[in-house]
Amino acid sequence: MKVESPLETTIKRAKLYQDAGADGLFVTGVSDNATIKEIALSTTLPLNVVGTAKLSSIKSLSESGVKRISMAVFLYRATYNQIENILKEVITEQSLEPLF
């Protein structure tokens, strides 16, 4: 969904949520720390974002005002990729050793 002024719209919505008594703000689609910082400074609500390859530094996100980082499906994907690699090794080596 395209929004004409995404940052301004997000800040306006954050204020509405805050005024309505929300306990937190979950913002998706942000891709840089500067934008996150602007959003965090615009509200007293704890800010939650989804970590991505571009937003992978917990320290940077925290310094930008993020209070909670969601991993979405990324943790599961990483786990399944690791399992797949181990199973390929088991099949190739015909040994259970890669499990240990």
Task: Go through each PLM region and give its residues.
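Flexible, glycine/charged-enriched surface loops at secondary-structure junctions
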Residues: 94-100
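Alpha/beta enzyme core
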Residues: 1-73, 77-85, 89, 93
